Every structure is written in structure tokens, then in C-alpha cells.
């Protein structure tokens, strides 16, 4: 395929996108400063409960509250606004909630990655290079809403503490003037770093571009060069101009060529296009599609990588062998969830074949059953593992995001590997480095929780926690409980307050003393007609906040529990984000919650058992979590980086 493109820049194309929101940026900055002052004054005072009236409302005037706008779709990407609030819905009545600076300041996380301010979305091009983990991300330098997208850049020694570097790539060429969109990194055997990314042209056509470091001797990779003959790929015949995006990390074929896949759709069928290259400048499109699944719509942020069937270690993207399965993951534009399938990769036929066609990509398994999208993995050659990043969006109003001056966080990086016990799903678990933030711990063994009981867990504070817990149902109750053919689904179940014979039971996180606000993370067990137990793992946001301009959903799915296993979970609580992992990471749920009372020193932790027919025995260990050091990089630090 030729390097030159039929798309040329408009003669009078404007490159002033970065100045469109100067007034918004100024407004956001002033509010952020006010938030910091209010927060400092608040935490300086001892308090047992949060006083929602301690700071005057900044969002109480409904007449001045702007309407939530659709963002992203007209430009050719998935909806970036809260679709529930976009439709005009409010949870409850009475207009928007009177948020104040105390509440909004509390929402900012302490150990999840996020920029100092403004909007962030997809993780891009993560890699490990010369002693540093690099993380790039979709970023709006001009405001707390989607738009004016460039690449932010940060580096870390341990995936926990981060230094913000200058922007890696900005929208300064005709082929990316409407956005430097998502891309992936490939490290070649000679050490060269290749970055392929999607650019939105001056005519909103999606094209693929090549960039590379200006100085490979710089471990921070601060400066990047865009290939002078970009774009290297344009939409092929039969693919619409706005349906061609997000190139993957390349993998090496047995012929010595590099292969990538790019997400698209043909009518309503999601597809993964395949290209081969030897130099990342010219490409050969393969006739076969890597995969295609009818009815799944546009595929964004495709990821493709091997996992070992024997070893616990991660594998380089180019690794092949008999004892390997391949993972294909897509982000569905239609519902904004990340789906994956396990299967076999046939290099000669250029085909991924799912192990279970009924659970092919976009149909069955998901990385995460909460708010988790546009994820991307990379092979960490330092620790021989595959690491997963995911974008955690907001579920509050856009107006509240503008008021607090930022929107979105990234998940805690997760190790991804095949579940050797089931062979049919992945395991995801926070990287071990997050445990370096653990402080004081409290341990509770064999706590008996009776049906209908709520038990306070006596810990110091409950805003930044790492919780590990196990639960057991009484064996006698299991034997007596009647069999049922009723299937349980978390999102239509009625939540943690709806009682059944063997559930729900678990933990209330971010709860206040009076339980006017709480977020349950729980198990629900059903005894099937064959006598087998079917377990669901859920997270219920319906009572997480008194605010009515927040989308409060119930998330979750089934979780495999093997014979002899106790029910186990791990929860990371970090202010407004709750990441939950069941059975070693077989099922994961990420939630965004926005309490108005259960904040700062007023946040509590409870055990609960809403089962009707069984006692539950719980054992748990709870760590207070330190804050990560996430701060700007200063040039004086450069001499310390080699």
C-alpha cells in the first residue's frame, strides 16, 4: 500500500482547537484552587461526621446549570458523556444536587493515576524502557470534558508513584488536527520504539500514523518525532472514514514480518482488520479478518496477546507455542464495555478462533463488569508479566466535573494471566507494587453474621483501604435450602437489599454511621435444581449517594467457584473509586461512587448478611492505604534518571 494519502489538508484549516476552552480552563482553575483551600480547612478540624452544609453549594442554581452535551460521537468515537444524564434522566426528583467544594475535593483519588487536572480517557502505548514504566493517555489540556485530545505522558519506577512529563504528542498536523487518538507501542529487537496511533484529520477521517522517540538514549522518551510521510494507513475500501481506529501492538510472524490489527465494523458486524509490515511505513492488507462477530457493532481499542497454559509468567506479544492460548479483547462502541475471548490463533490463515463461539468477543466474558473501558495491556519484560490498564470514567454530571476541574482516572494496573484451574477465563489482580502503600492493618477472624445483621468493622478510617475477605455459608443451611431454577442477575436483582435464601452478603464500603449512604460489594448464591451452587458477585451503587444527578447502577456477573474454595474477595477503596475482585480475579467490578456524607472521617466499613436462611462466617484483613506520589517532573530531576 502506498504511503501517500488521498486526504489532503484544507487550505484554511484551523489549528486553534486548543484555545476553544480558555474561559472554561480559567473557571476550572479558580474552582480547583477554592477546592484545595476548602479541603485544607476541612481536614484541619476533627469531625466524626461530614457536614454537607459546611461549604456553600456551588451547583445549586438549576437555571445556570448547562445541559449535558454529547461528546465524541460526531467526531467518530464512542460517546464520552454520561449517557444516562445525557438523556435527561435524574435519579430522584428535585433537580441537581447542591454539591459543595468539600464533597468535590474528597472525590479525587489518592493512589490511582490521574493528571493534575482536566479530562483523561484511554490508556495509550504503555511500555517499560530503560528502567522506567511509561504511560501515555488521551488528554484534554484545556478542560474537564472530552475534546482537543493530545497524548499525556507520565513515567514511574514502580507503576504506583508517577512523574508527569510534558505532552508527548499534540494535534499539530493535518492528519491529527482533530485529535491524537489511541495507539500502541512496539519495541523492536534492536531497541527501537515504534508508536502507531490514530489521527483524526482536518476532515475527521481516521488514519494511522507512525511516531518514534527523538532520542533512544533518553530513558524518559520526552521528545517524539512524527513520521514525515504520515499517514501510513487510511481507511480501505468498504470501511467508512470514521470506522478505522486504534492499532494494536505489533507481533512478529514466522516470515519475519510485523502484524497489527485495527478495529472497525461492516454494517453491524464488528471486525478486526489485519496488516503486515516490515518497516512500519508501508503495509500489506491481509484478505482475512482476524475475527468478525455479527451484531457487535464498532470495535474500538482491540488488543491481542498470548497467555501461557502452564506458566504464571506473562508472554511477549510475539510469543507462540503449543502451550499457549490467545486473548482477543475489544471495546464495544455500542455499550462501552470491554469484552474478551480465549482461543487459538492460526497465523497462516490469519484467524483467531474462539474456544467457545457462544462466548466470542463482544458476546460473553468481560474484563470488568463496572465502569472500565478502552483497556490496553503490555508485556513487562522487567518482571515477566502482562499488565492491564483501563480507563475509569465518571458517572456524575459533566457540570460537577467542570466544577472540580478534572474527570476520569485509570485503574490500578492489573496482572493478567490464564486461570489454570478453569482454563476458560482470565485472572486479573492488582500489581504487587500496590501493596507498598499498605500501612496499619486490622484483622478479624471468624465473625458470625446472622441473617439480617449489619456489623460495624472497627477500623480507623475507611476512605483509602485494601480489603481481603473470605466468607463461608453454614453447611447445614446449604443442605436444607430448597433448589431453585431462578437465575440471578446482578443488574436486575433489586440490589443488596433484596433478600434471598443464600444471599446477598458481603461488605458495605464508604458507608456513613446512619447508613443513609453505603456501597455494597457482595455475593449472592443460588442452589440450582441439580443441587449445584451458582454464585454471583455484585456491586450496588443504588444507595451510594444522596445526590440525584449521579447514575447509580448495580454491576456484576456470575463468578466460578470451584469445589473446596471459600468465597473470597479483594476491594481497593480510593475515595470515589471502588475496585473489587472475586475468587482471585475471575470476576472484577469497578465502581465510581459520590457520597455526600460518607466522606473523610465519616466513612465507615460494615459487614452485612441479607440472606434469609443462613448465617455467614467472615474473616477479613483491612489495610489503611498511603497516598501515591504523583507529581510533575522537573528538569532538575533529569540527571537522576539514568
Swiss-Prot record:
Provenance organism: Vicia faba
Cellular location(s): Membrane; Vacuole; Vacuole lumen
UniProt cross-references to SMART domains, sorted A to Z: Glyco_32
Protein name: Acid beta-fructofuranosidase
Lumenal side: 44-642
One GO molecular-function entry: beta-fructofuranosidase activity
Membrane topology (Cytoplasmic): 1-22
Recorded family membership: Belongs to the glycosyl hydrolase 32 family.
Subunit note: May be present in two forms, a 70 kDa monomer and a heterodimer of the 30 kDa and 38 kDa subunits. The ratio of the levels of the two forms within cells appears to be regulated developmentally.
Pathway(s) the chain acts in: Glycan biosynthesis; sucrose metabolism
A matching Pfam family: Glyco_hydro_32N
Cellular component per GO, a single term: membrane
Statement: the UniProt record of this protein carries the keyword Glycoprotein: yes
Membrane topology category: Single-pass type II membrane protein
Main location: membrane
Catalytic activity: Hydrolysis of terminal non-reducing beta-D-fructofuranoside residues in beta-D-fructofuranosides
The encoding gene: VCINV
Keywords: Disulfide bond, Glycoprotein, Glycosidase, Hydrolase, Membrane, Signal-anchor, Transmembrane, Transmembrane helix, Vacuole, Zymogen
SS bonds (residue pairs): 490-538
